Amino acid sequence: MNGIDGNKPLNRADEVERLIDAVKALIIPFIRAADEAVPSRAAGELLPNSQGAVHNALIDSRRPEDLVRELSLRLPQGEGLGEDGLLQTISDVLKYSVNTWDQGFMDKLYASTNPVGVISELLLGVLNSNVHVYQVSPALTVIEKHTAKTLAGLFGFTGPRAGGVTCQGGSSSNLTSIVIARNTLYPECKTQGNSNRSFVLFTSVHGHYSVEKAAVTCGLGSSAVWTVPVDARSGRMDASALRSLVQRAQAEGKTPLYVNATAGTTVLGSYDPFEAIAAVCKEFGLWLHIDASWGGPAIFSAAHRHKLRGCHLANSLTVNPHKMMNVPVTCSFLLGPDTAVFHRANTLPAGYLFHSSSPSSSSPSPPQITSTDNEKPIPEISAQPPLGKEEDVQKEEEAEEVWDLADLTLQCGRRADSLKLALSWIYHGAAGFERQVDHAFAVAAHLAELVSQRDDFVLVSENPPPCLQVCFYYAHGGKVAEDHQVNTARTRAMVQKLVSRGYMVDYAPGERGSFFRVVVNAQTLKTTVEGLVKALVAIGREVVG
């Protein structure tokens, strides 16, 4: 069907059914190929599949210019190509895309989704809702508020207006937190801009680059971001160094505003000392944000929850279920102890969209959101009180509950990303999440132990590592090369050669040149990392000779 014929009845349901069946015939073999490649990933080399063919299910690698030629993408300027053209394009996309379902994908801080994730994306596509106002997305609004409130409760945000909203990824959540911090601590900035203030944001030297991006976006400039030194071994922020930098900023006539602490840094996976950092923030009246995009889901695990000790002291917190929890990309929550603060910082009059602070009398009354789920509580924590002027805090205490969620964010168009976590939570339960998190951490520890036991490698990460990435150098003859450029060249060459064996891993710069950064996830098998080590040993001999 290439359009609507006003003289014929709609038959969209049958068309959707037919196309879903046709696409299903393409995507199921794609996923199955990854499942069938498990023996190859355990072996460290490609093995014949069930049909006797040797195939790299992870990726059919091409250079960009070659892929442009192979795809030969054309967007018809006249009549469309219909179902045949659609299915051929989908087939090509699958053929030339990285199969993140493959065990060998250990490259970035995310992995494949899972069967529930696929279903959730399908449902969102069918609904095609915009969760900006309650009127057009009633069920999804209730789900987002309840899911965010329950998730916030795990981090110790347990007040009556605790909760959060989803944003378009962790960078967007972090950006939104900075806007909220500025407009809360300095309300005049919402209408007058930054004026003559020279704000300073503080983040770990190992923190995510999104803080600098946000500073640029907010008109502060990247130079407004001051990086705080970390402990050389653990990679954790030095709270005493933070305090000194805050004092220096004040002495220079600047306005310290915001501290970004990290739960799971991008390279080493470090968890900053939140209690010590919170003490500095309290002393100087700074906004404390925790970027738990990567390491936040450890909160589900009794064994690893301690890494987030002090998270309840934050004024806001980012967590991305699409990273550690195999929820489809993107799914990012910005959480806090009081969402009235979010609303006051971001709300603007838009009478054509926001008709009232609560649903109209003709709309069904939304239920009161409470945290009655049977999640495991975090002991001895209570939420940080809101920051801001006394009269503003009083207004928050009297604020009505907000159901038009776009009014709490920088967005208008909002996809219902919370549904993806909600359905996964309903399917697996908090206990299932705990098992997944514990398994992933155990696999990371297993890989670190394998690396530490071999003379071919030198571990950079702690053993066990704090999060799910394991960092190490290749050490020919039991020794890392003195020349940094040699180490970098070896690492990059070995990473490239791994692809032909069915593995994708990353590398990062270090004191002795670039080293391997391998990221495992909740679906990674121990045999997979054992196979990876076998492959690295073999490739190392090829590269070094």
Spell out what each predicted region is.
Residues S173, V179-H343, T347, S360-S362, ...:
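Conserved PLP-enzyme active-site core in the AAT-like
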Residues L459-K497:
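Conserved PLP-binding catalytic core of the aspartate aminotransferase-like
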Residues L151-V179, W226-P229:
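Short loop-beta-helix segment that forms the pyridoxal 5′-phosphate
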Residues P160-R161, N196, E462-L468, P509-F515:
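Short Gly/Ser/Thr- and Asp/Glu-enriched loop/turn motifs at secondary-structure junctions
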Residues N2-R161, G502-M504, F516, L532-L536:
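N-terminal entrance/gating region of PLP-dependent enzymes' catalytic architecture
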Residues A139-L140, G164-S171, T203-S204, T262:
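Active-site nucleophile and cofactor-binding loops and adjacent substrate-binding regions
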Residues T265, G310-D455, E462-N463:
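Active-site C-terminal subdomain of aminotransferase-like
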